[in-house]
Amino acid sequence: MIQRQSHSTIYVIDQDEALKFYRDILGFEVKTDMTMEVSGFRWLTLSPKGQPDLEVILAQVSSSPMFDADMVEEMKALVSRGAFGIGVFETDDIHGDYGRLSKQGVEFVSPPQEQFYGTEAVVKDNSGNWFSLTQPKR
């Protein structure tokens, strides 16, 4: 029986730039950063500080053995245009995080807005992926 989700993948244009965003700006912690000898594939995972049992894989589109050259170009175009929503990151201070991240140059698709489930802002990472930054109603 399935017990839990342990990993989730975010496709990125440049792993080094994505690492700076998720680690240095969002505060995620690096769990694994290694290059596989045979394939040259870089396995880069991070976790939100409050959730070390979930690892986010930052997978560079061009380095994935799953994509042929045409697919790589298609995926890069889709990622950079924001075609993928990558999920929800929870916060306990949406307005404070919005101010802090805005000052650091993070692009917001929408500012914090009240929703039935809490207060949500929509953020873009430096590859073009968007995610919801949400402070749930308690």
Q: Each predicted region: which residue ranges?
A:
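Active-site beta-strand termini and strand-to-loop segments that position acidic
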Residues: 47-51, 123-126, 136
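Conserved positions at the start
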Residues: 5, 41-43, 118
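Conserved beta-strand segments that form the floor/walls of ligand-binding pockets within enzyme
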Residues: 7, 11, 45, 57, ...
